[in-house]
């Protein structure tokens, strides 16, 4: 007999929570850095900055400010490169297919609320057959204010007619957890991702997991 859950909806952040997109970010950024004679970066270096967005990636790794005359050119080149590479090496985090199967078996809906624009999110998600049962995708294109504002999470809940208190939001960045808390959902911090520190449990009163396989036991 299947266990009955109070949770009706699980919402995922995308980069660093649902999908490990770091390899394709690394390829794309290094291609542009090489183009302009800049030093390559390592996988670990870029993992620490993926969740900050493309503008901050360019600012940090090109070591320029936003007003630099070539900033927009570098950013445009990076985004073009990323669009070509976004589903080449990216993969679901280990254990994620089993988690999604569990949610399907228990009739728990799941979706994505991300700060990644739909132009990049849609082809990435569609390249994974395991994500065919995703019920909703909310990107910055769909809201006035992105995370840490709760608007995207609340929009997803509203569209699926699920109350926030029946929802879990999973993320790997402090802004994800802030958004979930503000929306009134339960939250789970994903330490296997890119941006949460090991001491995050001192800042947020919620469950934390170091592996995807730990998530099922946290679904009430």
Regions found by a protein language model. Name each.
Residues 4-98, 105-106, 131:
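N-terminal helical cap/lid subdomain that shapes the substrate entry/recognition surface
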Residues 20, 112-114, 189:
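Hydrophobic residues in well-ordered beta-strands that form the structural core
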Residues 53, 91-95, 116, 148, ...:
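Short beta->alpha linker loops
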Residues 49, 113-115, 170:
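Structural motif
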Residues 13, 17, 114, 172:
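Conserved G/P- and acidic residue-centered "switch" motifs that form tight phosphate/ATP-binding loops
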Residues 1-8, 44, 118, 122-220:
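Asp-based, Mg2+/Mn2+-dependent phosphohydrolase catalytic module
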């Amino acid at each position: 007999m299947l266990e009955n859950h109070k949770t009706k909806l699980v919402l995922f952040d995308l980069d660093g929570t649902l999908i490990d997109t770091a390899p394709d970010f690394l390829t794309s950024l290094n291609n542009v850095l090489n183009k302009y004679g800049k030093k390559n970066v390592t996988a670990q270096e870029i993992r620490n900055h993926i969740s900050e967005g493309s503008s901050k990636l360019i600012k940090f790794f090109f070591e320029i400010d936003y007003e630099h005359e070539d900033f927009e050119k570098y950013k445009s080149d990076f985004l073009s490169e990323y669009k070509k590479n976004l589903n080449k090496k990216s993969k679901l985090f280990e254990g994620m297919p089993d988690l999604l199967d569990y949610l399907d078996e228990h009739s728990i809906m799941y979706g994505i609320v991300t700060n990644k624009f739909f132009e990049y999110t849609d082809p990435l998600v569609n390249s994974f057959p395991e994500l065919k049962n995703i019920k909703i995708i909310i990107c910055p294109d769909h809201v006035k204010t992105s995370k840490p504002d709760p608007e995207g999470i609340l929009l997803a809940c509203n569209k699926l007619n699920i109350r926030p208190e029946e929802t879990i939001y999973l993320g790997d960045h402090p802004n994800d957890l802030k958004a979930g808390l503000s929306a009134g959902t339960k939250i789970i911090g994903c330490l296997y991702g890119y941006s949460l520190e090991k001491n995050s449990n001192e800042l947020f009163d919620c469950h934390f997991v170091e592996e995807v396989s730990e998530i099922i036991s946290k679904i009430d």
